[in-house]
Amino acid sequence: MALKIEKTFQVNEPVEKVWDFLSDPRKVATCVPGAQITEKVDEKTYKGAISVKVGPSVTDYKGEVRIVRLDNQNHEIEILGKGQDVRGRGSASMKMTGKLRALPDGGTEVISVSEINVVGILAQMGSRIITEVSNIMFGEFIKSFQERLQQPSEGSSETREVKPIKAGSMAWEAAKGVFRGKS
């Protein structure tokens, strides 16, 4: 199942500070629910994992993200990611482009376009539910992203407890949104 998700949001931080954070996958991963970077392969390639909890079961994906384009002058980035369920029940791939725009008030606008392809157990939920779950996850990402931007810089190898994404409760909220006609 293929999805395209376009999101734009603003943060009250200068573009250079946002770019420093957004152009480092190790920092960004700390904002993604259930995700972690496990290994730096080279300057543009990272291995990682993400856990998704659906009801009582947990689905674990392992994969790789690679920066294919990094334009520091224009604050644009393109990332490709791919991963496999460790139990062989599916896979996912993603192409994400991001662009930053400085705002007159000193803040930054973040523009993100993601093309996602999901195969297997998660794809069985259907595109409307997956889209709603993605919207909820993106909201959590934005909240965490804004909080981490405001923290003093302590390096990018932050240690944190990684908890699986609770897609079961997200799917329930997403289903309620679908039935209310919000998607």
Outline where the language-model segments fall:
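Intrinsic-disorder/low-complexity, polar/charged segments enriched in Ser/Thr/Lys/Arg/Asp/Glu/Gln
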Residues: 2-10, 45-47, 60-62, 76, ...
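Beta-strand/loop substructures that line and gate deep hydrophobic ligand-binding cavities in soluble
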Residues: 69, 83-133
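Glycine-rich portal/gate segments that line the openings of hydrophobic small-molecule binding cavities
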Residues: 40-84, 182
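Generic structural detector for well-ordered beta-strands
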Residues: 8-10, 51-53, 66, 99-101, ...
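Hydrophobic pocket/interface hotspot
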Residues: 18-22, 28, 67, 112, ...
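A conserved amphipathic terminal alpha-helix motif
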Residues: 121-156, 168
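Hydrophobic ligand-binding cavity/cleft-lining segments
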Residues: 1-45, 49-55, 161-183
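A generic structural micro-feature
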Residues: 1, 40, 55-61, 88-92, ...
